Curated annotation (Swiss-Prot):
SUPFAM superfamilies: 6-phosphogluconate dehydrogenase C-terminal domain-like, ClpP/crotonase, NAD(P)-binding Rossmann-fold domains. In the N-terminal section; belongs to the enoyl-CoA hydratase/isomerase family. In the C-terminal section; belongs to the 3-hydroxyacyl-CoA dehydrogenase family. Residues 311-728 are annotated as: 3-hydroxyacyl-CoA dehydrogenase. This is Fatty acid oxidation complex subunit alpha. InterPro entries: 3-OHacyl-CoA_DH_CS, 3-OHacyl-CoA_DH_NAD-bd, 3HC_DH_C, 6-PGluconate_DH-like_C_sf, ClpP/crotonase-like_dom_sf, Enoyl-CoA_hyd/isom_CS, Enoyl-CoA_hydra/iso, FA_oxidation_alpha_subunit. Substrate binds at residues 296, 500, 660. NAD(+) binds at residues 324, 343, 400-402, 407, 429, 453. Coiled coil: none annotated. Its EC number is 4.2.1.17, 5.1.2.3, 5.3.3.8, 1.1.1.35. Keywords: Fatty acid metabolism, Isomerase, Lipid degradation, Lipid metabolism, Lyase, Multifunctional enzyme, NAD, Oxidoreductase. The active site is at 450 (for 3-hydroxyacyl-coa dehydrogenase activity). Residues 1-189 are annotated as: Enoyl-CoA hydratase/isomerase. One of its GO terms (biological process) is fatty acid beta-oxidation.
Length: 728
């Protein structure tokens, strides 16, 4: 053994060939600060070997290296600039030393080689891979860019256009594409990976493969003349700005950095990469996107704990074949859980099956499943007009019309037909679960399971715990939702649960703004372009449906009369009273026609202004700052109340529910990350300017207390001593 640490071993393999093996104690290899420090020492041990002829890098795990340890990022990014630069320089010096070894080097890649893992293999002369690999640089998805030489070596290895495509989009690619563009040199069966890599290394040692020629382009400027350079980068910058937009600076920064470094050799180009990386790492966008990644991992970890407690249902039933019921049945079947879809109408069943067939056909056309899988999936949805066979179901999801009496009757009837340990779940968006449970003999087996429309696209499922719901029931529903490919988040029962409860105050704030003379078109523009919502509030209400929004207002007003009751008619009431229901009937805040693809196209409608003029003050010109404050403060306050009341268990779960359920702008990271960025004291000070507008704008006491103590809702991670990799 030439060198050994907790994560890396270096030993002689044969005939002057040494192997450096990544072998972390955990299930996967990460390039955390400890491993980087170990890699420094491992390379030093190789540099001292006089008989060294070649070096093989490989992994003992099912994946090569999945990337850096993202749990360390927020602490690293909060370091002083000089510390962050020191860490990057130190890390890059290690990969330079791999690249500068006086012998040929090769990486044997299996599984994932992402981020720092990809940058590691780029530093070797050759790369051989198994067919199952995914390799790429996903950093821009985290609001940063490659920092270990990826933006320098990749374009010099595979060409500027190919590299920009991977780096700017944060892409990873498979073995076939990686071989085609030159990122890897060979694809071999997994069982022959190491032998093939050694054989290739022996060819290089013997002089049959020119390893110096393979290495040289990575040390030099890009092979582009001035005209080619201008064309490549101008096209890339235009595409990136169109796709990423102004709120996500990482992709365009990466492109500009590669452009600036195009005429530099490796060492100067790496300095440029570091100079571009550091400002990105210290942006609020990077903190938000890294926060989303960490929160997502946390939420998935909670779901895994539930999975340990129960068996995933193997057969399900869905009651109701409408938009939601049909979508739930499709998603269940698509993910391998056969499902019985029951309705009282043959026409509804046919519509449900047709919708499933249409979605499967789209998957088939995109090459995501073959004809056999498509047919098998469709045949695993059993449409029926009666309950025969429902006793086989381990879980039944009720998705009938949003009427408490009908839902209670259907659930009560179903309970008499299923096994005693069968779990019942109601897909409701507004009806309290504890109320529905009163019609059941086994309320402990019942909970809410709130899907979002369209079911096949929206990642969130709210799992609602009623007063008498058992933990086994919650775990079973979480397991089922996870198997369906969804992100389940458990919330406690209350009117609107979590997502709809916090959405309505946002819409009420919008209504107050209209009452005071705001223009819904300007508000939509500000909330989309400046704040970053996928849809402004008026457009969102049209998509939801004004009838649905009107009903939701009524339910929430009963549940929270002090904040959400309105003793006057607002915009939603007026448009609803005039049969303007939004996209569903072509008239809402906007009017809708169909485009060439048959999709709703939004247009202005003077009649809306005439109707709103009856309840709204004369038009006023609000600033973007005022519009954002007046719509967002009610939502932020309500989210905080939900945490304080225990409706939702943690800031991480709240933020993920907002991002996955409402499309809260990811670059803000969710309400609690947004509060952290602004600072709790600054938020309270801002909100106090609007306190005169009513109860919705009153800051919850817990948030005020945090502001007084200058506390955040997220704890700070341990700081990292970058030179040693030890936590401080």
């Amino acid at each position: 053994m030439l060198y050994q640490s907790e994560t890396i071993q270096v030993s002689w393999l044969k005939d002057g060939i040494a192997e450096l093996v990544f072998n972390a104690p955990a299930a996967i290899n990460k390039l955390d600060t400890k491993t980087v420090a170990s890699l420094d020492k491992a390379i030093a041990s190789l540099e001292q070997q006089t008989g060294l002829k070649g070096v093989l890098l490989r992994s003992e795990k099912t994946a090569f290296i999945v990337g850096a340890d993202i749990t360390e990022f927020l602490s690293l990014f909060d370091s002083p600039v000089e510390k962050l630069q020191e860490w990057l320089n130190f890390s890059n010096s290690i990969f330079n030393r791999i690249e500068d070894l006086p012998v040929p080097t090769i990486s044997a890649i299996n599984g994932y080689a992402l981020g720092g893992g990809c940058e590691c293999v780029l530093s070797t002369d050759f790369r051989v891979a198994s067919p199952d690999i995914r390799i790429g640089l996903p950093e821009t998805k985290l609001g940063i860019m490659p920092g270990f030489g990826g933006s320098v070596r990749l374009p010099r290895l595979i060409g500027t256009d190919n590299a920009l495509d991977i780096i700017a989009a944060g892409k990873d690619i498979g073995a076939e594409e990686a071989l085609k563009n030159g990122l890897i040199d060979a694809v071999v069966p997994k069982e022959k990976l190491v032998d093939s890599a050694v054989s290739m290394l022996e060819q290089a040692i013997a002089g049959n493969l020119d390893w110096k020629a393979a290495r040289q382009p990575k040390l030099e400027p890009l092979k582009l003349n001035e005209t080619e350079r201008g064309m490549s980068f101008s096209v890339a910058k235009g595409m990136v700005m169109k796709v990423a937009g102004p709120h996500y600076p990482a992709p365009i920064t990466a492109v500009k950095s590669i452009e600036k470094a195009a005429t530099f050799g490796r060492d100067e180009a790496l300095k440029q990469e570091t100079a571009s990386f550091i400002p990105l790492a210290q942006t609020n966008v990077a903190r938000a996107l890294v926060g989303i990644f960490l929160n997502d991992q946390y939420v998935k970890g909670l779901a895994k704990k539930h999975l340990k407690e129960v068996t995933i249902p193997e057969y399900a039933a869905v009651l109701g074949a409408g938009i939601m019921g049909g979508g739930i049945a499709y998603q269940s079947a698509r993910k391998g859980i056969p499902v019985m879809m029951k309705d009282i109408s043959q026409q509804s069943l046919e519509l449900g099956m047709n919708e499933a067939a249409k979605l499967l056909n789209k998957q088939f056309e995109r090459g995501r499943l073959d004809a056999i899988k498509m047919a098998r999936t469709l045949s695993s949805i059993q449409p029926t007009l009666n309950y025969a066979g429902i006793e086989q179901a381990q879980i039944v999801v009720e998705a009938v019309v949003e009427n408490p009496k009908i839902k209670a009757a259907v659930l009560s009837e179903t309970e008499t037909l299923v096994n005693e340990d069968c779990v019942l779940a109601s897909n409701t968006s507004t009806i309290p679960i504890s109320e529905l449970a009163k019609s059941l003999k086994r309320p402990e087996n019942f909970c809410g399971m709130h899907f979002f429309n369209p079911v096949h696209r929206m990642p969130l499922v709210e799992v609602i715990r009623g007063e008498k719901t058992s933990e086994k029931t919650i775990s079973t529903v979480v397991a089922y939702a996870s198997k369906m490919g969804k992100t389940p988040i458990v919330v406690n029962d209350c009117p609107g649960f979590f997502v709809n409860r916090v959405l309505l105050p946002y819409l009420l704030g919008f209504g107050l703004l209209l009452r005071d003379g705001g223009d819904f078109r300007q508000i939509d523009k500000i909330m989309e372009k400046e704040f970053g919502w996928p849809m402004g509030p008026a457009y969102l209400i049209d998509v939801i449906g004004l009838d649905t929004a009107h009903h939701s207002q009524s339910v929430m007003a009963q549940g929270f009369p002090d904040r959400m009751h309105r003793d006057y008619k607002d915009a939603i009431h007026v448009l609803y009273d005039n049969q303007r229901y939004g996209q569903k009937n072509g008239l809402g805040f906007y009017k809708y026609t169909q485009d060439k693809k048959g999709k709703p196209k939004k247009e202005q409608d003077e009649q809306t202004d005439q109707l709103l003029a009856t309840i709204c003050q004369q038009k006023s010109n609000f600033s973007g700052e005022e519009i954002i404050a007046r719509t967002m403060i009610p939502m932020i306050n309500e989210v905080v109340r939900c945490l304080e009341e225990g409706v939702i268990a943690s800031p991480a779960e709240a933020d993920m529910a907002l991002v996955y359920g409402l499309g809260f702008p990811p670059f803000h990271g969710g309400v609690f990350r947004y509060l952290e960025t602004m600072g709790t004291a600054a938020y309270v000070k801002m909100a106090e300017n609007y306190a005169h507008l009513g109860a919705l704008y009153q800051v919850p006491p817990g948030l005020k207390a945090k502001a007084e103590r200058n506390e955040s809702y997220y704890s700070t991670a341990a700081t990292i001593a970058v030179s040693t990799g030890k936590t401080a």
